[in-house]
């Protein structure tokens, strides 16, 4: 069955999700159709930003407008909505939408996201950490907990999707007592281009000119997908002046002693086995630009593994836009199987 999708919010993640879907469709791995997008931006701007992208380049499809409310991408026609009144006002039922990808960043609590269900959708996937959701899913880590009964689903954050495979391998193989992480993260639209007012006074500073320390909920969110680690991890982010391509540094106290070789072997086995497609193993001395447009959630850098006694440091890269958007596509496919 083809899963019919509506996208609410056609910004960075909404457009990346659609591009990732096109890429997977070309490979024959996604039976998903986007039937509508909703955004308060005018349709000509949406079409232009889909066609031209500063990171991903030009979309290899013709993109045009048909009438006032249809975006044409190659052979596909997408209904373009401009509903401002909130999720409950969207015509998902009339359009036969099965799953909504909620990517505005505005409706991340269950009470607001439920409006999509009231409007006729069967499931909602929030492309961000959420509150009061039915389940948070990180593919490869706890997707077995999704049983079809949950209607409001969070795909967690890009950083949690990178961190969770690290913690899973370490905890499964050696046991984690506690840990601290840092994500060195590309800047995002939540930061200022130039110094200006912001509720976070560090994010108030010019994103392209500074290393900006700020918060991340990624470590604490691990407890949602690995309950045995609840309260055992914490950390923060350092936003850096690049547009995409981030890296997570995790230092953990292990229950069992392990060498660098033991840890690297465990990650290589996981990348080639149970976490294939989610976790990637690298021995090459890579830098951030090398992993841009890599679809994996977590790209393990074996050359950076360090161990002192029972304390281990592991590092994994991730394209915080493209990798995450590919997991959104995969999660839509997973949810679609339960419809």
From Swiss-Prot:
Q: Which reaction does it catalyse?
A: D-glyceraldehyde 3-phosphate + phosphate + NAD(+) = (2R)-3-phospho-glyceroyl phosphate + NADH + H(+)
Q: Which GO terms describe its molecular function?
A: glyceraldehyde-3-phosphate dehydrogenase (NAD+) (phosphorylating) activity; NAD binding; NADP binding
A single GO BP term for this record reads:
glycolytic process
Residue ranges of coiled coil: none
Where's it found, cell-wise? Answer: Cytoplasm
Q: Which residues bind NAD(+)?
A: 12-13, 39, 84, 127, 320
User: Keyword annotations for this protein?
Assistant: Cytoplasm, Glycolysis, NAD, Nucleotide-binding, Oxidoreductase
Give the residues annotated as active site: 158 (nucleophile)
GO CC annotations on file? cytoplasm
Chief location category: cytoplasm
Please report a single Pfam family linked to this protein. Gp_dh_C
Annotated binding of D-glyceraldehyde 3-phosphate, by residue: 157-159, 188, 203, 216-217, 239
Which pathway does the database say it acts in?
A: Carbohydrate degradation; glycolysis; pyruvate from D-glyceraldehyde 3-phosphate: step 1/5
Annotated site residue numbers, Activates thiol group during catalysis = 185
EC number(s) recorded for this UniProt protein: 1.2.1.12
Q: What PANTHER family does this protein map onto?
A: GLYCERALDEHYDE-3-PHOSPHATE DEHYDROGENASE 2
Q: Subunit structure, per the record? A: Homotetramer.
Question: What is the purpose of this protein?
Answer: Catalyzes the oxidative phosphorylation of glyceraldehyde 3-phosphate (G3P) to 1,3-bisphosphoglycerate (BPG) using the cofactor NAD. The first reaction step involves the formation of a hemiacetal intermediate between G3P and a cysteine residue, and this hemiacetal intermediate is then oxidized to a thioester, with concomitant reduction of NAD to NADH. The reduced NADH is then exchanged with the second NAD, and the thioester is attacked by a nucleophilic inorganic phosphate to produce BPG.
Family statement drawn from the similarity comment of this UniProt entry: Belongs to the glyceraldehyde-3-phosphate dehydrogenase family.
* Descriptive protein name: Glyceraldehyde-3-phosphate dehydrogenase
């Amino acid at each position: 069955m083809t899963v019919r999708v509506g996208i609410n919010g056609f910004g960075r993640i909404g457009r990346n999700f659609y591009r990732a879907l096109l890429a997977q469709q070309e490979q024959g791995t996604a039976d998903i159709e986007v039937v509508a997008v909703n955004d308060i931006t005018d349709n000509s701007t949406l079409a232009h930003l889909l066609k031209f992208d500063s990171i991903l380049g030009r979309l290899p499809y013709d993109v045009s407008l048909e009438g006032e409310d249809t975006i044409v991408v190659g052979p596909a026609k997408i209904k373009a909505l401009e509903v401002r009144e909130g999720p409950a006002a969207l015509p998902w039922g009339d359009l036969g939408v099965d799953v909504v990808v909620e990517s505005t960043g505005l409706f991340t609590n269950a009470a607001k996201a439920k409006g999509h269900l009231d409007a006729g959708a069967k499931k909602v996937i929030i492309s961000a950490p959420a509150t009061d959701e039915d389940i948070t899913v990180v593919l490869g880590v706890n997707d077995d907990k999704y049983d079809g009964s949950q209607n409001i689903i969070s795909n967690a954050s890009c950083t949690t999707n990178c961190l969770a495979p690290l913690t899973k391998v370490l905890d499964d193989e050696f046991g984690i007592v506690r840990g601290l992480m840092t994500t060195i993260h590309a800047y995002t639209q939540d930061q200022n281009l130039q110094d200006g007012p912001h509720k976070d006074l560090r994010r108030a500073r010019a994103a392209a000119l500074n290393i900006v320390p700020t918060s991340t909920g990624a470590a604490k969110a691990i407890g949602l997908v690995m309950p045995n680690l609840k309260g055992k991890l914490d950390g923060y982010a350092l936003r850096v002046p690049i547009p995409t391509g981030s890296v997570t540094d995790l230092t953990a106290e292990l229950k069992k002693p392990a060498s660098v070789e033991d840890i690297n072997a465990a990650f290589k086995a996981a990348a080639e086995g149970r976490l294939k497609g989610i976790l990637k193993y690298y021995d090459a001395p890579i830098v951030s630009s090398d992993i841009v447009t890599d679809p994996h959630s977590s790209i393990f850098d074996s050359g950076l593994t360090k161990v002192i006694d029972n304390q281990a440091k592991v590092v994994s890269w991730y394209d915080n836009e493209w990798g995450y958007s590919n997991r959104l596509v995969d999660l839509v496919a997973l949810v679609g199987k339960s419809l």
